Amino acid sequence: MSVKKKSKILTLFKRMLVFMLSVVLIWICFHHIMKLVERDQYPAIGKYIQVENGRMHVYTKGNGPNTIVLLSGLGTASPVLDFEPLMNEMSTHNKVVVVEPFGYGWSDMTDEKRTVEHIVGELRSALQQLNIPGPYVLMPHSVSGMYSMYYAREYPEEVKAVVGIDATWPAALDYFNETPPSMPGYMRYVAPAGLARLAISLDARNYLPLASEGTYSDKNLAMTKAITAWNAYNENVVQETNELGDNVKKTAHISFPSDMPVLFFSREDDRVREDGKSLFTFLQTQLTDHPASTIIPLQGHHYLHWTQSKEMNEAVLKFMNDIEDRE
């Protein structure tokens, strides 16, 4: 190959490299401009509570004899938006509260480690500053089950009951001999680099609730897409994921107080392992001695509230009535 031809190829390669870098930089700039526009277009729908050195976004709806605190699963873009159908159902008879943890929804980021102690402490501080008296009905989804159990064990006088939404309880990993998930540190750059926005632009279905049309409003879905573009896999979510192993070790030995009523919503799952263990047999080990404690299997996604909000609301009303009848 002649020197002249090599020079042309090298020049072409350099131009292509410059072009690709330019496209990347333009996209990153576009993402951050859109982020500013969207933050102005979609302001927080609740109110901010100052906790430690940051602001936590809190949303409340309804009134009633019970205060139900909805707690989100790991990495949920905006718990307030995600729980909207369930809030709408439950707020007809109860006060419903959603506290978005640091790194979620409209809440700030935090430098505090994502230990179970810090996460529960921040939640508790936010609830206290709302001046909403307990005891609360904690209603955790997924990994928040672990935080709820810790809260109930440390502060039993502040918890009236716990209702799990396909929740993760600390003893599950040991029971099924599984390991906690982890997330590579570089994932924290997905949102700042505009990659989350790109993924949503290409196929938003993977980032939106799998619910029937009309369950979530168009505005809700638009805000969910925007917040996902801002926050997906952010540093706090990555830290929380990688802290799960230690958090499970801290909580694996604890259980709910024996007299605390608990209700477990779980996905219908008929699978039984060779050792005879199943989701149902595990949940039976987590039930308390309270006569109202029970397990209710439901058809649906891990995010059961996407499709079963009405059924869940009716079951919780019955559950709370059973508790009151036995007091």
Give the predicted meaning of each segment.
Residues 2-68, 92-94, 321-327:
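Alpha/beta-hydrolase fold catalytic core
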Residues 57-106:
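Conserved HGGG/HGGXW glycine-rich cap/lid loop of the alpha/beta-hydrolase fold
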Residues 75, 101-105, 147, 169, ...:
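Alpha/beta-hydrolase active-site loop signature
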Residues 98-139:
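Active-site loop/oxyanion-hole signature of alpha/beta-hydrolase fold enzymes
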Residues 134-177:
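Conserved hydrolase catalytic core segment
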Residues 168-200:
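A catalytic-pocket lid/entrance helix-loop region that shapes and gates access to the active site
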Residues 216-289:
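Conserved serine/cysteine hydrolase catalytic core
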Residues 290-327:
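Catalytic active-site module of serine/aspartate enzymes centered on a nucleophile-bearing elbow/loop
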